[in-house]
């Protein structure tokens, strides 16, 4: 029996509420709650994470859209009216992450908060949000890999509804969203299980662990996708950026250990909680 999964969850008058949006919102909520909970242990107030979120989410979406438009400029230069039509699709996670990082650095400077500690606290939640939001691609039947066979998908022992959803226009496709979501879930479990061990992570290293893990996963998965953004029609943008981030994070980790010598992550912010900025 065919299981047709509708990307639209429900309608509000003339507006469609899609599962992709619901899953993204759920991911943001989970990330926020995780950051607030961990932040209390590291002596960072919940209000700081909520205030950061109010800036980071909208600017992150703008960054994700700008990133996509820049690398699809051949199309958007001919259809400038579509540049702001984000409701038609077209955002890129790396653009959102870059924009969010810029917001965080400015926010930490204004609030006098340690940026690497904030990154450490926020990174696992971001990873959890990515695990959840990738299922929006599943509901939309997008961001998939190349054509494959029913027998291959069955050999992965996938639930029938996943296999059925990968049947698009008469062919089966690789569920790359599932590969990325699963691998990120493994990375998230590892980070969460290790981050509270004494004398393991110094400040900034949980964030760098996330960068190393995600960039490796994205490089692998991006090579399988059929909707990649390209540079000069030859180089996959996300693979190139993943390589830069992977090696850049390793170099920064070594540099900070040998030269900067940061505090241990478990030492927290050093601020008296709850603190007063007046």
UniProtKB/Swiss-Prot annotation:
Entry protein name: Phosphatidylglycerol--prolipoprotein diacylglyceryl transferase
One Pfam family matching this protein: LGT
Superkingdom: Bacteria
Listed pathway(s): Protein modification; lipoprotein biosynthesis (diacylglyceryl transfer)
Enzyme Commission code: 2.5.1.145
Membrane spanning stretches: 19-39, 49-69, 86-106, 112-132, 174-194, 204-224, 235-255
Any one of the GO CC terms: plasma membrane
GO BP term, example: lipoprotein biosynthetic process
Gene coding for it: lgt
Protein keywords: Cell membrane, Membrane, Transferase, Transmembrane, Transmembrane helix
